[in-house]
């Protein structure tokens, strides 16, 4: 097991985006400022998506303008398209993230596009990030199970990881989106993914059901070089 584990904090974005009650901008800023004092080196604070689809993130530019930035902390934003990237860049994002899926059904439901089309959409974002010298991170959802398509083949996950790697993602987070994976399924998926990207460039978010969480994550930590996020 690695002696170093980095925790990448996503609460201000992923944790808040589905809240039905609109949270005041000042409260979001206060949360991020507190997190900035805890020792996190990277915090995902905003999502530059259409407010029609994610109203909670409509004030992302204001949030990024008002936070008190701590030296050594990188503030990240989710940017699904070039318009979102341009807004994140203008807001001073230190890093941007794009998100895809290993499931066709989930991709169409959440991105209104199949896997291949969604990856094509990300290419201009990746190119713009590279030109601007802004680090690019990738997310892959449904790496084990999908609410629409059921179990996902390890090769399908590896294929999306390879595509995100090829367009410039320096790190890729593997999401067990609905928390149904088992240790054996995770192991098979990781073995396929590790053929495309080294462990040091992969992250694993701790989503799980209470019954599977302890066994799953003991096994993940044994994969040298993984960082939880």
Question: What do these predicted ranges mean?
Answer:
Residues 1-229:
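Catalytic cores and adjacent flexible loops of soluble metabolic enzymes
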């Amino acid at each position: 097991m690695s002696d170093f584990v980095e925790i990448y904090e996503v609460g201000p974005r992923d944790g808040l985006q589905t809240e039905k009650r609109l949270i005041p901008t000042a409260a979001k800023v206060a949360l991020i400022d507190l997190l900035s004092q805890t020792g996190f080196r990277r915090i995902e604070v905003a999502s530059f998506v259409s407010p029609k689809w994610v109203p909670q993130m409509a004030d992302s530019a204001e949030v990024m303008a008002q936070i008190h930035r701590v030296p050594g902390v990188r503030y990240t934003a989710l940017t699904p398209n070039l318009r979102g990237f341009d807004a994140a860049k203008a807001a001073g994002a230190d890093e941007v993230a794009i998100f895809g899926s290993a499931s066709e059904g989930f991709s169409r439901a959440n991105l209104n596009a199949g896997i291949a089309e969604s990856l094509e959409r990300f290419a201009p974002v990746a190119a713009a990030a590279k030109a601007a010298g802004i680090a690019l991170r990738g997310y892959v959802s449904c790496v084990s199970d999908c609410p629409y398509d059921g179990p996902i083949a390890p090769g399908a996950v590896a294929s999306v990881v390879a595509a995100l790697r090829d367009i410039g993602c320096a790190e890729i987070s593997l999401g067990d989106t609905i928390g149904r994976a088992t240790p054996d399924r995770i192991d098979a998926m990781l073995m396929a993914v590790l053929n495309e990207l080294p462990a040091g460039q992969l992250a694993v978010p701790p989503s799980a059901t209470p019954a599977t969480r302890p066994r799953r994550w003991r096994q993940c930590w044994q994969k040298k070089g993984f960082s939880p996020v």
